[in-house]
């Protein structure tokens, strides 16, 4: 039976990152066992159309002169908006926003941030602490902080930003993080006033205290999002909808400001009022945005004045360049695509029922063990391999000669004689590849509801579904940031899955500093996921970025979080 399902689902294993995340084009790609996309003529023709559409065919850049204190970068994308809180609001499903987040990292800074090594480091807060119960997090601002125009940065500016993010008119996946704050969700739903939210301003506006509803040991990691950077209420109030539209209508809290915005071009200058300005080496960074393949990329990379460029390896022509620009770094990241089961729906509260549905929906992709993507490592070892070895078996459903028997067992345990119609919510541009199979192999009737990505987020938050499509865009490098989604009180636990042992393991992993302990408990948590099936994992999309740079460029680094590039340390050898 499974082989039949696998044949029906042959083309379903990987979804194409470039299209699902761009949300613009429908494109089918062939794939390899590792999840990277192979190139073919159809793929390249469609891709060239995207190139022409996004960046304009043969568009010529007037590249600025490369000087010792000027860095000229060719980037894949430029942001659609320069309003930090709206980074992922306009098109939250669009990969453009996620890949261009590294530009925002230069313009804005929050209480804490992630450095080039993936570690949480002080940002505008010089220190922070939390109590033993992990429900109160206190952040102490640095002395004398200023925005780019010299206006003091105060603790209340962070409160303004957080409350703005809790405005239901702003649809960003990262808003869910703020539901962890006491009465954060209630404020979002209009049930309480701002003064009832667990945000306190202390110490003469130099300290902010965030009170959580439940203990979260890794809350500081969640607060590294650029959307949580400060917002001056007076400045924002005067501009209203004009805020962030042009460089002059932005207050910058990061190491750079926008000097000018041109056609596919962004000119940045050092923010002299940034607290750590003396350690920022480049006075100017010129970013040229676009998307290239083959000859187009080669032509741009060879342009006089370009210091570095980042490209997708899948579409990078490896023809030797006529200059001294060389490949120096390569990094694979990716996205996870899955469907969440609403465990509050009686028929989906049983693991056997979920496992049977998962087996049919995911088909051959379900051969992967657990939830964490195959390319993720921990402690120098492949995480999925460790978890599968520890679990000793793949999904139990594959050991049944007839998956229908597994479904019937689950229904019997629930005292249900017949499967009800399931409401499956998917994105409006997604393809329904499972309704026919669910009916054919399990006798389950399905109602498919297609919605916009924003409505998908809203329905997820309201738990208005039986099964709902979800994805993690440009995934994380740490397994815990995947597995924490199924912790009972996680803001991303849309299916209300709850397992006390699982919660305990994730809590230990979030608090321990021993990598061996962390690895052990996360593997155990993955084993629980594999047994309980709170979601149907449809696979993952892996993509590899490549940096090409000229000799003498230092400090530029590919990172799997907060965009794709770490640009703060860029400098040139003298």
Report each predicted region and the residues it spans:
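Alpha-helical secondary-structure segments
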Residues: 72, 154-161, 205-211, 255, ...
